[in-house]
Amino acid sequence: GKSSATLLISSDPEKGFTQIADSDSLFNYPAYRYSDSIYGGSIWDMVEYNNSLYVSICTGTEDNMPNNNTMQSFALVRGDQNADGTFTWTPVAGDQKKDGARYTFGIDPERTRSGAANLMVFNDYLYIGEYNDEEIALERILFSKTGKNADGQFGGGLDCRFLNANLDQSVNLYRMDKNENMELVVGNSTKMFPNGSLSGLKSGFGRNENQYIWRMEVYDGKLYVGTHDASSLLECFGQFVNGNLLKRTPSEWKDQWSYLKALMKALQTVDPNGNGNPDALAQTIKFSYNFVFKNITVRNMASAIKLLNYLRTAKRGFDLYVTEDGVNFETVTIDGFGDPYNHGLRVFATTDQGLCLGTANPFYGTQIWIQRKAD
């Protein structure tokens, strides 16, 4: 069949769904292949606002990359239901020339890093939180995949330019009124927003390591905003400049030494499937030689140094902020509730007991926290 993103609707899921949109009706914006932005994030988020359905879409593909270190930013479209149940789609943020969108991809033409956007309605505004493309950025380092159709290699490289560009532009928070006028709530000043943000806060709530506004939730008349902190995953680099190596306990150093001894022992193990061909060793040495001299370049070293400068003062662990008026924010945490391995606030759930949240923690597993309902 036809390859396409699809959007379905149902008033009774047990009786089935009706398709209301596909890639064609969504202006061919959805990027849904693995090589695309955020591993093909496609139709990313949706919310009802002002009697319309607003949908954020990942659009970045290898074919529309502005340059080797930039994917095309997200789109925002509005769906209005017709009398016969079909939907008419209008681009709000997208291709201004071709499709007549009011805003460009990513809303602000100076903002180029966010592959997706998360949506939440609060106080009669639609809040739009940016989500930077960290997947491709980290893939560049892990597998040395740089540029269109790069095959990559096991063991990675040191090309940190994509990641550094993300850190240069940490995430913004916008809000849109019922007339689709945009305001900058959190972010740096640009030509589009010369006076800066309504809150006075810079991009990433003033912290470059905040790379997603991952989840938002309305609870007890307040808007809660949680982030993803990239510095948790980048501690393998950050530990060399943030002082954490000096803070290691004797037990931690003992564990590290045990890991090194285990590695050396594994390297000495004889491969029972080996064929005794000495040329195989020569090929291994040749690969290692080529790998080092391909990756240890002036450009890559400069990009690594720039990355280390960002990580020097980064505070690991997700951030959580709360606001009653949608503009002035209070800080709940900037360090994942004291756990640097809680790198993201992944999900909220409102219950009769209070506001629950689940952390993203790929190191030793998720945690669930609750803020009890006020009496």
Model-based region annotation:
Residues S3-G16, N67-F87, I141-N181, G238-G276, ...:
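Beta-propeller blade signature
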Residues E217, L223-G243, H343-D375:
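Blade-level signature of beta-propeller repeat domains, shared across WD40, Kelch, NHL, RCC1
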Residues E48-N51, V55, L119-I128, S170-S189, ...:
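Extended amphipathic secondary-structure runs
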Residues T18-S37, F87-E110, E180-N208, D255-A282, ...:
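Surface-exposed loop and turn segments in beta-propeller and other repeat-based domains
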Residues G1, E48-S56, G60, V121-G129, ...:
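Entry beta-strands of beta-propeller and related beta-repeat scaffolds
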Residues G1-Q96, R111-L119, D124-L126:
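Solenoidal tandem-repeat scaffolds enriched in leucines and small polar residues
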Residues P30-E48, R102-V121, Q169-S170, L198-V218, ...:
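Signature of short aromatic-glycine-proline-rich micro-motifs recurring in repeat-based ectodomains
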Residues I43-D45, S52, S56-T59, W89-N118, ...:
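Extended non-catalytic domains of envelope/secretory-pathway proteins
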